[in-house]
Amino acid sequence: MNSVLNSGRNTICDAYNVVVHDPFSFQHKSLDTIQKEWMEWKKDNHSLYVDPIVGTVASFLLKKLGSLIGKRILSELRNLIFPSGSTNLMEDILRETEKFLNQKLNTDTLSRVNAELTGLQANVEEFNRQVDNFLNPNRNAVPLSITSSVNTMQQLFLNRLSQFQMQGYQLLLLPLFAQAANLHLSFIRDVILNAEEWGISAATLRTYQNHLRNYTRDYSNYCIDTYQTAFRGLNTRLHDMLEFRTYMFLNVFEYVSIWSLFKYQSLLVSSGANLYASGSGPQQTQLFTSQDWPFLYSLFQVNSNYVLSGFSGASLFTTFPNIGGLPGSTTTQALLAARVNYSGGITSGSIGGSNFNQNFNCNTISPPLSTSFVRSWLDSGSDRQGVNTVTNWQTESFETTSGLRCGAFTPRGNSNYYPGYFIRNISGVSLVLRNEDLKRPLYYNEKRNIESPSGTPGGARAYMVSVHNKKNNIYAVHENGTMIHLAPEDNTGFTISPIHATQVNNQTRTFISEKFGNQGDSLRFEQSNTTARYTLRGNGNSYNLYLRVSSIGNSTIRVTINGRVYTASNVNTTTNNDGVNDNGARFSDINIGNVVASSNSDVPLDINVTLNSGTQFDLMNIMLVPTNISPLY
């Protein structure tokens, strides 16, 4: 029976079904299509209390960041968040958060918050009306000064934002605060981009450039601090820990990670944060705290630079009659051991057990870039038929963009799928994690077996974790199994996540570090003279290369591309930074210089870092920015 379960593949056509790999699928989708996908997602995914508008808004902001079209983001964002002037969507976000956190605002506070939402909507609508009047003087009366309208709106934002930071309700109100901050920062960006057309003076322009930097700092730090305070208080199962994190990333950090990039234009953000999903089965009873998270996080991320092809392992399917001649039986499904497989013959360490013969293999069949995994089923549970017949089931199943399903057992229970996200990695945990593992995060690409402590009852068990992100501009698979990043065909800039390297020397002293105010996570170098190589498929365009780094202490960065070496000496962001305290990193964007991505060839990009003694260094983002567009500050 086990072989039948593992060989059966059902072809199912879903909304995300595609036939060929489109590396720029996000850019090619209309906002209407994205909005419909999130609405469909909400109908099918009732286990996570996330309103679909949060995914739509994040996609809208990323699209605007990657475009030069439209300088009035605030007007369009207002129509998304307050359709037809209604505050219902924002109230829905609050209600969903109340359900998720099992916390409610008292009656007076709820009335106050709803009044603030109504006032915020009215303020934004009135400001947009005044701008329209200014730009169309023949149609309506012209306001005395658009600068006066701008400054009034700025003060109104400051007054209202504070109302979503009320003592005792900071976490509950954080998703609403993030949406209000989206509006405020979009407003400031609009003022800067439209300064000439709106007749804004040079002095006022400088003021709003400072506002964009300062409020990006303040709002980012507030969101990070509020989340981390709550996360540090967790003492719960892995599923609940990951679900809390996913909820906050979709509702808050998808935006926070964009804010620090608002100073750029025409930048395709192809890096991004990960969402993690695991099962909610009764067998996984081990409790975790924030002190365990550095290890868990490193386990889920350790091979993120490789192109995933599937996983294989040993599964068990047994049925035993009840003892003593009693009627009925007990059936058990169990994943005993697993390994994750990547292109190029790369595999992870074993998860669960190590001395079992493989009896299933789950892969994408077609090339993994053409049919990536997008959905997972990871639950487990028990079914009872009558009094004496019990089935203890487990799933650990996945589905590709073409609708093919495979895994250890048959899909059932809640699935994990997010519109626009791909499963770019699979990881997992044993029934019980060893203390020696929990205290020792994995280094970059480390291959470590993850097993329960010796003698653990039922310890030879594996439970998978799916890793979802939006990374899709992958041109091909490098010969060593890693990603080759694809540059856009037009003059749009793009980003590369530092964790998606082709290779890194000094691997045992290189770690992946979680970040919140940055599009994706960082590579932390703990040894001097470390070099990370990235491979990109060029288009012949020139770019200004910016490296987002945190260097607490002095460092020297040398970048080599097309045989040319660029050097940034005495880099130190201890005090010279953007002000965001991002999980211990204080970053600044360093302009390395003008580089060329050679046309139709795979271009190596080497980043070498020399550290002074004691320097803490994070490589946080690699940004290739159009040469004809300067940052807004």
UniProtKB/Swiss-Prot annotation:
GO molecular function, one term: signaling receptor binding
InterPro entries: Galactose-bd-like_sf, Pest_crys, Pest_crys_dom-III, Pest_crys_dom_I, Pest_crys_N_sf, Pest_cryst_cen_dom_Cry2A/18, Pest_cryst_cen_dom_sf
Keywords: Sporulation, Toxin, Virulence
GO BP term, example: symbiont-mediated killing of host cell
Pfam family, one: Endotoxin_C
Keyword Endoplasmic reticulum tagged: no
Signal peptide start and end residues: none
Function: Promotes colloidosmotic lysis by binding to the midgut epithelial cells of insects.
Family in the record: Belongs to the delta endotoxin family.
Misc remark: Toxic segment of the protein is located in the N-terminus.
Protein name: Pesticidal crystal protein Cry2Ad
Gene encoding the protein: cry2Ad
